[in-house]
C-alpha cells in the first residue's frame, strides 16, 4: 500500500478527534484492547562459582537432544552463537517496521470506523479512500514482535534462544499516547544445569525448565 498523503493523515486525525480526547488513555480503547496484566521479565541469578558449571562431558549434544526431545525448536533455539545474534530492535527502523504488515482479519473497531473529510464542505470519503485510511490505521497501530538472540549462559541448553520484545520507538496510537506492550507470553522448554549439595557431595544434572518469551505485542496504555 502506497503512503497516504499528508492531508489524508490530517483528515484521519481530525476524524478521530471527535471520538478520542488526547491525553486520556481510556478513550483509546476504541482502537486496541488493553491487556489485563503485564508480562514479568525473567532475571537470571546464578552463583558465579565455576564448580557449578557443566563440564565438557556434560555437554554431549546427542544425549541432550534426546533429553529435550520434541521440545527442541530449531527456529528459536541454537547450540552455537547465531550469525544474526545482534539483529534486533535497535536496528529496526521505521521503514522496516512498516513492511511488517498486519495479517488476518482487520480488528472490528477499525473496520467499523467512519471518517469525515474536513476539506471545505464536510463530506464522507469514497469507499476506496475509506479502505485506505482503515488499512493505514491498522498498519500504524500494529505492534510487531521484534526477535533477537539471547545468550542464557553455559548452564542452559540450548544456550541461545530467540526471544521477543515489543517495538517502542514511537507511539502506536492516533493521537499519540499508547505504546506497544506484551499482553501474554508463550514458553520454550530448555534444559538447566542444576547442582544440589548431598551427603555424598555435589550432585548435578540437567533438568527441563520452561522459559517465558514474548509471543504477542498490542497497543495499550503505558501504565
From Swiss-Prot:
Q: Where in the cell is it found?
A: Secreted
Where are the glycosylation sites?
60, 93
List the SUPFAM superfamilies: Cystine-knot cytokines
Q: Which residues form the signal peptide?
A: 1-23
Major localization class: secreted
Q: Does the keyword Secreted apply?
A: yes
Q: Name one GO biological process term.
A: determination of left/right symmetry
Which GO cellular component terms, listed alphabetically, does the Swiss-Prot or TrEMBL entry include?
extracellular space
User: What InterPro entries does this protein's entry cite?
Assistant: Cystine-knot_cytokine (IPR029034), Noggin (IPR008717)
Under the heading PANTHER family, the entry gives:
BONE MORPHOGENETIC PROTEIN INHIBITOR, NOGGIN (PTHR10494), NOGGIN (PTHR10494:SF5)
Subunit info? Answer: Homodimer; disulfide-linked.
Role noted for this protein: May function as an inhibitor of bone morphogenetic proteins (BMP) signaling during later stages of development including late phases of dorsoventral patterning, to refine the early pattern set up by the interaction of chordino and BMP2/4. Not involved in organizer function or early phases of dorsoventral pattern formation.
Protein name according to UniProt: Noggin-3
Amino acid at each position: 500500500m502506497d503512503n497516504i498523503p499528508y492531508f489524508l493523515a490530517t483528515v484521519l486525525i481530525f476524524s478521530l478527534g471527535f471520538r478520542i480526547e488526547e491525553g486520556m488513555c481510556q478513550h483509546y480503547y476504541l482502537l486496541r484492547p488493553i491487556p489485563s496484566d503485564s508480562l514479568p521479565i525473567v532475571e537470571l541469578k546464578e552463583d558465579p562459582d565455576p564448580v557449578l558449571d557443566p563440564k565438557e562431558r556434560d555437554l554431549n549434544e546427542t544425549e541432550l537432544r534426546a533429553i529435550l526431545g520434541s521440545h527442541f525448536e530449531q527456529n528459536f533455539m541454537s547450540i552455537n552463537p547465531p550469525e544474526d545474534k545482534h539483529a534486533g530492535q535497535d536496528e529496526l527502523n521505521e521503514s522496516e517496521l512498516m513492511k511488517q504488515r498486519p495479517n488476518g482479519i482487520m480488528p472490528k473497531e477499525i473496520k467499523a470506523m467512519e471518517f469525515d473529510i474536513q476539506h471545505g464542505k464536510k463530506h464522507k470519503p469514497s469507499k476506496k479512500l475509506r479502505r485506505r485510511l482503515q488499512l493505514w490505521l491498522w498498519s500504524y497501530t500494529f505492534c510487531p514482535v521484534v526477535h533477537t538472540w539471547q545468550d542464557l549462559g553455559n548452564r542452559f541448553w540450548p544456550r541461545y534462544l530467540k526471544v521477543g520484545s515489543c517495538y517502542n520507538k514511537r507511539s502506536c496510537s492516533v493521537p499519540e499516547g499508547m505504546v506497544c506492550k506484551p499482553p501474554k507470553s508463550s514458553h520454550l522448554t530448555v534444559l538447566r544445569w542444576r547442582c544440589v549439595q548431598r551427603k555424598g557431595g555435589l550432585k548435578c544434572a540437567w533438568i527441563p525448565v520452561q522459559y517465558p518469551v514474548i509471543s504477542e505485542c498490542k497497543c495499550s496504555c503505558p501504565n
